[in-house]
Swiss-Prot record:
This is Alpha/beta hydrolase domain-containing protein VTE7. The keyword Plastid applies. Its EC number is 3.1.1.-. The lineage of its organism: Eukaryota, Viridiplantae, Streptophyta, Embryophyta, Tracheophyta. Residues 84-315 form the AB hydrolase-1 domain. The keyword Hydrolase applies. It is an enzyme of class 3 (hydrolase). The active site is at S157 (nucleophile), D279 (charge relay system), H307 (charge relay system). Belongs to the AB hydrolase superfamily. Keywords: Chloroplast, Hydrolase, Plastid. Hydrolase involved in tocopherol (vitamin E) biosynthesis. Releases prenyl alcohols from chlorophyll biosynthetic intermediates, which are then converted to the corresponding diphosphates for tocopherol biosynthesis. Provides most of the phytol from chlorophyll for tocopherol biosynthesis in seeds. Its main location: plastid. It comes from Arabidopsis thaliana. GO terms for cellular component: chloroplast envelope. Disruption phenotype: Stong decrease of tocopherol (vitamin E) content in seeds.
Amino acid sequence: MMGSLKIISPPPPATRFRQRVTANGDGFPTFLPKEIQNIKDPFARALAQRIVRIPVPLQMGNFRGSVMSSCIKPLVQLHDKSPVVLLHCFDSSCLEWRRTYPLLEQACLETWAIDVLGWGFSDLEKLPPCDAASKRHHLFELWKTYIKRPMILVGPSLGATVAVDFTATYPEAVDKLVLINANAYSEGTGRLKELPKSIAYAGVKLLKSFPLRLLANVLAFCSSPLSENIDWTNIGRLHCQMPWWEDAMVDFMISGGYNVASHIKHIDHKTLVVCSENDQIVSNQLSVKLLCELANAVLREVPDSGHLPHVENPKHIVKLISDFASGKLY
């Protein structure tokens, strides 16, 4: 007698996420700093309304539990394409992608923007370790819990270092890499890790200051009016208003930071190396060096852009990522 035949339906082509977040009267999540109300950039305001927190299990050092981790989730999760996962620069947040994220969605790419542990807008009142290993482990647990498929991992500046570090440890989680103005050859935080904590906290307070952030912004962008630079500076330091930020930054500084130069030659994933024509922070020569050391890479330059082309020239960045994802570029 024949056994019963079970017919298994194929997976649905897409899954639609339900977004649940408590918002204030202006639509901003209540966990964001009140200074969000002062931001003028309409792209930042729109993207801020989509920031959510999702529980990510984490076991590092003496920390055991779940971190309510801030990110921007795609409205629809596809099952037949690699998702695009956006990291951010050093000491920044997912709002860095305010001008690029909506264009990636328009290009029909499933896109996540994730706040690296210790930065962004997560709930870290019970502070876990925020060293490089913890940041890597947190990203892996988020990927394993929610994304679950090899991803196109995109990292600008120090975010490229985070991406290389992650890929070297969890190659199975990555389909392709996009490294934008990569700061991949820095040797950690150097002698900062030897500072007494009192001095480290003083340095972190300086890092948070508006004048220093404004100066960094002026260097980062090719050309933007002062009023725009001021607003963008406020966007870039918004996460610094989180109550745990100083402790997380000091923990990262004294941990030694990232040192991934020795991993680069072992990365064999297809990689798009992107450099900007007018980057005043990271030399284009480092992008060429990266191209030469990676086993499977191509290089493209973004015209009329400084260190953050995904803010200044988002259409060009989206075209590069879209073509790279579809195989047209490589």
